């Protein structure tokens, strides 16, 4: 079985993420969407809610598993789960410049390859950070996030 991992914080998961994950699902037998927590970041949604959003939005895709990734190296996580590839979406050359050193280190540590998928043009500008900022400032993000995510954003606005 060819297994890949798509790691990220997914705060929140958006249509650009979904597009990359769906394409990865066409390339691998199983894709683990590994939802992470970086303690240096401030999150809008707690880990369990980010996992729930990913599961809800990816439920129709075959071969997708959503789970938290614990602390530690992604290379070790891949080795423990028999992952042969890390899949990363690239929006720009700055994404590549950021991701390449990590891809090289992951390959050296565990032998796992990183597969870079260029993001579709209409998603090139999307990031979870930008979506949260636009939403917080009153902008409409409904074209950029799944309906279930939009509902959670709106629900959090009133609490």
From Swiss-Prot:
Protein name as annotated: Phosphopantetheine adenylyltransferase
Main location: cytoplasm
HAMAP family linked to this entry: PPAT_bact
Role: Reversibly transfers an adenylyl group from ATP to 4'-phosphopantetheine, yielding dephospho-CoA (dPCoA) and pyrophosphate.
Superkingdom field: Bacteria
Similarity-based family: Belongs to the bacterial CoaD family.
Subcellular localization, as worded in the UniProt entry: Cytoplasm
The species this protein was found in: Arthrobacter sp. (strain FB24)
GO molecular function: ATP binding; pantetheine-phosphate adenylyltransferase activity
